[in-house]
C-alpha cells in the first residue's frame, strides 16, 4: 500500500502571509543560471495554501522544514539600528538582537511542532542553527523539540545559515540526532561567496564522524550536482530529494532531464524522494516533473513520489 502514498518530502510554511512573502521574495534561486521558462507559484507559504494543494494533488503527508538563519536575521536587525549610537548603546542593542534571535528560533520551531499536532498530515522538521544557539544550546533545543514537542527531524541550510556542514560546532547537534534516531534534511548547493559550505563534498567530514546519522542531501546537490554521486557512493547513510533541481533541467548549470534521471538511477532510485520546495513551486507541478523524467520505470517514479519517504524518514 505504501507504493501508492504521495509524500512531499520538502515544504516550507510561515506563520503569516507577510512572513512568507518576505522570505520568498528575499531568497533568490540563482545557482542554476538562466532558464527561459521557470515555474512560478503565487503562494506565499500559508498553512491553508499547502493543505489545499495537498488535497488537490493527493498528497497525504508533507514534511515541513523550518528555514531560519540567525546570520540573516542579525544582519537585517543590525543594519536597521539608528545612527549615532554610542559604543555601549550599540553593544546593548546587539545583545538584545541576539536574545531576540534565540527566542525567535525557539518560537518558530514550537509553532511548527504545534502545527503538526493540529494537522496530522504535516510533519515537523525543526531548524537547527548554532549561530542562534551556540555551544550545547542547539543540541539541547533539538532534544527538547523531539522529546517534548514531537519534532520528527531537523533542517539545516549551511549556505543560508552561514556555516559549513562539517563545522564542528554542529557535532553536539549531530550526535543528538544520531542518538535520537531522527533524520536531518540539509540544503545542498553552492553559495554566492564560493565557500562551499553546503556543496555535497562539504558533508564528507560530518558523514565520516556520524556513520549512523540519516542525512538527506536536498536538491540532489543543486547547482553542485556533479559532486553528488561520489558522496552517495561513499556514504550509504545519505539520502536525497529532487525538489527544485527537477524544475531547472533546461538551465545553464542544472542537469538535463536525461542527466537527472541517470543520476537518480546511479544513486539508486530508492534513496531519492520527491519534494516541492513549496511555496517556491507547486506540489502538482513537482509530481508531474518526476513523472516526466526518462529512463526511470513507472514503479521507480511512484516510489519517489511517496513510498521512499515513508521508508527513509520513518513516517
Language-model features: where?
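Divalent metal-dependent hydrolysis catalytic cores, especially in the metallo-beta-lactamase
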Residues: 30-76, 88-96, 121-129, 152-153
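Mid-to-C-terminal alpha-helical segments outside catalytic/metal-binding sites
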Residues: 2-9, 18-61, 262, 268-273, ...
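Active-site gating/metal-coordination segments in enzymes
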Residues: 75-186, 191-192
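Active-site gating loops and adjacent loop-to-helix segments of metal-dependent hydrolytic enzymes
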Residues: 17-44, 77-99, 149, 236-242, ...
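Histidine-centered divalent metal-coordination motifs
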Residues: 10-16, 187, 219
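Conserved, mostly hydrophobic/aromatic
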Residues: 10, 54, 112, 154, ...
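Acidic-and-aromatic substrate-binding clefts and catalytic sites of carbohydrate-active enzymes
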Residues: 39-45, 70-73, 101-104, 130-137, ...
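Catalytic pocket-lining loop regions of alpha/beta-barrel enzymes
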Residues: 149-153, 160-273
Amino acid at each position: 500500500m505504501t507504493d501508492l502514498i504521495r509524500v512531499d518530502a520538502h515544504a516550507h510554511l510561515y506563520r503569516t502571509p507577510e512572513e512568507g512573502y518576505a522570505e520568498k521574495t528575499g531568497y533568490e534561486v540563482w545557482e542554476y543560471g538562466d532558464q527561459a521558462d521557470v515555474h512560478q507559484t503565487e503562494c506565499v507559504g500559508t498553512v491553508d495554501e499547502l493543505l489545499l494543494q495537498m488535497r488537490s494533488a493527493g498528497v497525504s503527508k508533507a514534511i515541513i522544514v523550518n528555514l531560519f538563519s540567525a546570520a540573516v536575521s542579525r544582519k537585517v536587525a543590525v543594519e536597521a539600528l539608528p545612527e549615532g549610537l554610542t559604543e555601549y548603546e550599540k553593544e546593548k542593542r546587539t545583545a538584545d538582537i541576539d536574545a531576540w534571535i534565540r527566542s525567535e528560533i525557539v518560537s518558530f520551531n514550537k509553532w511548527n511542532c504545534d502545527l503538526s499536532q493540529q494537522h496530522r498530515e504535516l510533519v515537523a522538521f525543526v531548524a537547527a542553527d548554532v549561530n542562534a544557539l551556540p555551544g550545547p544550546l542547539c543540541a539541547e533545543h533539538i532534544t527538547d523539540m523531539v522529546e517534548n514537542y514531537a519534532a520528527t527531524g531537523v533542517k539545516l541550510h549551511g549556505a543560508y545559515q552561514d556555516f559549513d556542514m562539517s563545522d564542528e560546532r554542529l557535532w553536539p547537534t549531530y550526535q543528538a540526532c544520531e542518538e535520537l534516531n531522527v533524520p536531518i534534511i540539509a540544503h545542498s548547493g553552492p553559495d554566492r561567496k564560493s565557500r562551499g559550505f553546503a556543496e555535497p563534498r562539504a558533508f564528507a567530514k560530518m558523514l565520516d564522524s556520524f556513520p549512523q546519522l540519516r542525512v538527506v542531501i536536498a536538491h540532489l546537490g543543486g547547482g553542485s550536482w556533479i559532486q553528488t554521486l561520489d558522496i552517495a557512493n561513499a556514504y550509504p547513510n545519505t539520502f536525497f530529494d529532487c525538489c527544485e533541481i527537477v524544475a531547472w533541467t533546461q538551465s545553464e548549470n542544472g542537469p538535463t532531464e536525461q542527466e537527472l534521471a541517470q543520476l537518480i538511477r546511479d544513486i539508486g532510485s530508492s534513496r531519492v524522494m520527491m519534494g516541492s520546495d513549496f511555496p517556491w513551486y507547486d506540489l502538482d507541478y513537482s509530481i508531474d516533473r518526476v513523472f516526466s523524467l526518462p529512463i526511470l520505470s513507472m514503479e521507480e517514479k511512484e516510489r519517489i513520489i511517496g513510498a521512499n519517504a515513508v521508508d527513509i524518514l520513518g513516517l
